[in-house]
């Protein structure tokens, strides 16, 4: 068997049919898996000595959440170094990164593997991996034919990365124009809620607006702040972190604004505060709702006039700082209760973001579980850590009141338990390794001023409410439109029309 012109043309046509990069990537690897009759295929992006899965076919869903470092995966390191088609013999002693991750074949190891490095010019930008349980599966294809496949995949990935960079440059003045792939932010998730959040981050990152990040405890608000900073013109300067909840009132002002020698007992020298440290960069104030009203007033002055005063000093210092603030409180309620200044709230919430709770993110739970499994594998020096099908279902059925942080701890604990009950360096996580209650119900969605921004009129408010209702229904029903329509008690055709009118569908 060999590739015909018709086969290659068919692959190219499938790429053109895709709507958006992700759809094109999925069409590419699905078509390749069919053409090559292999058991699994994956398109990976290369960045910072690791491969990041972009699209998979025939592999467990949690693979999309894993990050494959070169140091931890010798086969992928060989692909990255080769510069050409890499064929691994069936008896290769190099472990395959997908062992145990092909559904229905969890107990078997991959026998045939081909790796195709993908280049943009001289730069490695990714790889295409093809795996089969039959040892001789890829012998009928020549290296030249596989190079043609690699060229098609490299073109699709290179175009996607270039468009991504150009879109970013439109928001970042002074960009160099040199091809530089956008950096990974570890914001893992493909659910509608996370896709929307990522879009909002892209919109606001390139501006210099202050941002208020809301969400339940453990949802990943700090990661959002890092992503905003990383995508901003200030990314070359520091991102300074301060947890306001951990600040005793007696030292809070000094931590924020600094102090001069002799300002108080123990002030034995001049000391810069967080605002000075973050000059020309970004200051992330976590749990900002915990600040006292007196400190809120001083923080407001910095946001208004851009100057600070060290404790014990009469002089003012100019600072250029972007403030990102996070809270798990409803600050609008805090304002009404007199515990938070209304003027500071409005200064901070120019562009509010809301990080969705984990129970609203659908299958993102499995992707995140894969990410934490890979972290545990590297940390404990194991050859593999995989989730059984029962374990995946168990994780999806749980409500996760502690959100992503609870999931991370649950995975780490389960790996330790599973490792203790099984000899060797291969760990399979089963449902019984997780101390989770099956009857835990998802926490009710957080009512937040962040979920729906202030609107000018009734129509705009109604449309925003409808958008949020549809997004939540889709997230809770794994993006199944028919199931979402039933949950909303409406006809599916009407739901599609409404979603198009509201800009939720093309």
Curated annotation (Swiss-Prot):
The modification 4-aspartylphosphate is found at residue 57. Keywords: ATP-binding, DNA-binding, Nucleotide-binding, Phosphoprotein, Transcription, Transcription regulation. SMART domains: AAA (SM00382), GAF (SM00065). Pathway: Nitrogen metabolism; nitric oxide reduction. ATP binds at residues 215-222, 278-287. InterPro entries: AAA+_ATPase, GAF, GAF-like_dom_sf, Homeodomain-like_sf, NorR, P-loop_NTPase, Sigma_54_int, Sigma_54_int_dom_ATP-bd_1. GO terms for biological process: phosphorelay signal transduction system. Residues 187-416 form the Sigma-54 factor interaction domain. GO terms for molecular function: ATP binding; ATP hydrolysis activity; DNA binding; DNA-binding transcription factor activity. Residues 481-500 bind DNA. Required for the expression of anaerobic nitric oxide (NO) reductase, acts as a transcriptional activator for at least the norVW operon. Activation also requires sigma-54. PANTHER family: ANAEROBIC NITRIC OXIDE REDUCTASE TRANSCRIPTION REGULATOR NORR (PTHR32071:SF35), TRANSCRIPTIONAL REGULATORY PROTEIN (PTHR32071). This is Anaerobic nitric oxide reductase transcription regulator NorR. The gene is norR.
């Amino acid at each position: 068997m060999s590739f015909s012109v018709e086969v290659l043309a068919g692959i190219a046509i499938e790429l053109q049919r895709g709507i958006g990069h992700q759809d094109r990537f999925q069409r590419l690897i699905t078509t390749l898996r069919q053409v090559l009759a292999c058991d699994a295929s994956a398109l990976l992006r290369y960045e910072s000595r690791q491969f990041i899965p972009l699209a998979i076919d025939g592999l467990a869903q949690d693979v999309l959440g894993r990050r494959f470092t070169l140091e931890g995966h010798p086969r992928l390191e060989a692909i990255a170094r080769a510069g050409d088609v890499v064929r691994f013999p069936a008896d290769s002693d190099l472990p395959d990164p997908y062992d145990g991750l092909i559904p229905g074949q969890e107990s078997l190891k991959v026998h045939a593997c081909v790796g195709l490095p993908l280049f943009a010019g001289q730069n490695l930008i990714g790889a295409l991996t093809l795996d089969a349980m039959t040892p001789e599966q890829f012998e009928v294809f020549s290296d030249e034919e596989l190079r043609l496949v690699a060229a098609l995949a490299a073109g699709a990935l290179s175009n996607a990365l270039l468009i991504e960079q150009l879109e970013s440059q439109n928001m970042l003045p002074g960009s160099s124009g040199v091809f530089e792939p956008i950096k990974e932010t570890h914001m893992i998730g493909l659910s509608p809620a996370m896709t929307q959040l990522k879009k909002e981050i892209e919109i606001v990152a390139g501006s210099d607006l202050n941002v208020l990040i809301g969400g339940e405890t453990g949802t990943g608000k700090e990661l959002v702040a890092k992503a905003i900073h990383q995508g901003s013109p200030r990314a070359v300067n520091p991102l300074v972190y301060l947890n306001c909840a951990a600040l005793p009132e007696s030292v809070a002002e000094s931590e924020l604004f600094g102090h001069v020698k002799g300002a108080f007992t123990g002030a034995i020298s001049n000391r810069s505060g967080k605002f000075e440290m973050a000059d020309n960069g970004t200051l992330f104030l976590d749990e900002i709702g915990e600040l006292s009203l007196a400190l809120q007033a001083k923080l407001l002055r910095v946001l208004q006039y851009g100057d600070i005063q060290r404790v014990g000093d009469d002089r003012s210092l100019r600072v250029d700082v972007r403030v990102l603030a996070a809270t798990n409180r409803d600050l609008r309620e805090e304002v009404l209760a007199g515990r938070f200044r209304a003027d500071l709230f409005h200064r901070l919430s120019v562009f509010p973001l809301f990080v969705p709770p984990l129970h609203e993110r659908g299958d993102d739970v499995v992707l995140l579980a894969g990410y934490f499994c890979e972290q545990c594998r590297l940390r404990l020096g194991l050859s593999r850590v995989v989730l059984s099908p029962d374990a995946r279902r168990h994780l999806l059925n749980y409500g996760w009141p502690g959100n992503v942080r609870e999931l991370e701890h649950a995975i780490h604990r389960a790996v330790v338990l599973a490792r203790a009950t099984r000899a060797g360096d291969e760990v399979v996580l089963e449902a019984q390794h997780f101390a989770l209650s099956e009857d835990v119900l998802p926490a009710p969605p957080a009512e937040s001023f962040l979920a729906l921004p202030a609107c000018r009129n009734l129509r705009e408010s109604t449309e925003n409410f409808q958008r949020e209702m549809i997004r939540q229904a889709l997230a809770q029903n794994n993006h199944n439109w028919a199931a979402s329509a039933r949950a909303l008690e409406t006809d599916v055709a009407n739901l599609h029309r409404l979603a198009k009118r509201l800009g939720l569908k093309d």
